[in-house]
């Protein structure tokens, strides 16, 4: 995921790199940067299958059209994430196209969510589209948030720490 963000021009760095339970972890420092669309090759899919929902959100704010390929595994996660991502992007006014194992997302200057985001009880879909809602004048509404506590119980408190207003 980090490599794809760097390809897109993200200004991010790792600090305080360490190991926890046999996995590398770090603090991430991110600064504003203008993102650009990229082709995300299929060889990234296995290592970042859970990051595609948030990557699609970032793609909606990247100049150009981002194409992600090799996404068949997204269809058999907690939900058919490929369709969930696509349908919800369309609900937010983001231009997108998809096929059996690919997704294209085009830059969207103004996100306008006129319909409730359908999460399909998938925490990653819920969190990703709530983040997209931060760029919408009136935010977004999602149909369910209970499942977010499963993976990130501090999600809303962290957003509030950043000054996000949550209704």
Annotate each language-model stretch with its function.
Residues 1-167:
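Short, structured segments at the rim of ligand-binding sites
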